[in-house]
Amino acid sequence: MAPKKAKRRAAAEGGSSSVFSMFDQTQIQEFKEAFTVIDQNRDGIIDKEDLRDTFAAMGRLNVKNEELDAMMKEASGPINFTVFLNMFGEKLKGADPEDVITGAFKVLDPEGKGTIKKKFLEELLTTQCDRFSQEEIKNMWAAFPPDVGGNVDYKNICYVITHGDAKDQE
């Protein structure tokens, strides 16, 4: 391991392992999968370039350095998996699950329209982490049909995930 990487990795070890008691094993595995997706260069540390590459993979090519710097400053040092888990633990304390899920979708909706493209969502769901089967995709589109423009209302999806039934259309 290069000295620079060793120094970064050693500095990242500062995260507390007690955060692992906040989540069950399934949740920890899901966070690990998300961490792995973001850690584009697979060095065990999320850095500014990993964030830039992750945004690029999602189609957002013009992320400003200031935005990336602000994200990196949310951590007190290098972001290894324990620090990543700690950050989510802090963010999720007392949070409404619907708000948390909606917040995750909002990352994919930089224009704040409340919708995301069907094609993009389908690509994410079939190529990242716990991949959807074609049958699961078909069932999802039956439950949450996109509009004529190919947009999916993610707020309705979030509501159903957290409440178990479709929200009445206003």
Curated annotation (Swiss-Prot):
Keywords in alphabetical order: Calcium, Metal-binding, Methylation, Motor protein, Muscle protein, Myosin, Phosphoprotein, Repeat
Gene Ontology molecular function: calcium ion binding; structural constituent of muscle
Recorded superkingdom: Eukaryota
Residues with the N,N,N-trimethylalanine modification: 2
GO biological process, one term: skeletal muscle tissue development
Residues carrying Phosphoserine: 16-17, 76
Positions carrying Phosphothreonine: 26, 36, 102
Domain EF-hand: 26-61, 96-131, 132-167
Ranges that cross the membrane: none
Matches recorded under PROSITE patterns: EF_HAND_1, EF_HAND_2
Quaternary structure and interacting proteins, as annotated: Myosin is a hexamer of 2 heavy chains and 4 light chains.
PANTHER family referenced in this protein's UniProt entry, alphabetically: MYOSIN REGULATORY LIGHT CHAIN 2
Function in brief: Plays a role in muscle contraction.
Entry protein name: Myosin regulatory light chain 2, skeletal muscle isoform
Source species of the chain: Bos taurus
Lineage of producing organism: Eukaryota, Metazoa, Chordata, Craniata, Vertebrata
The encoding gene: MYLPF
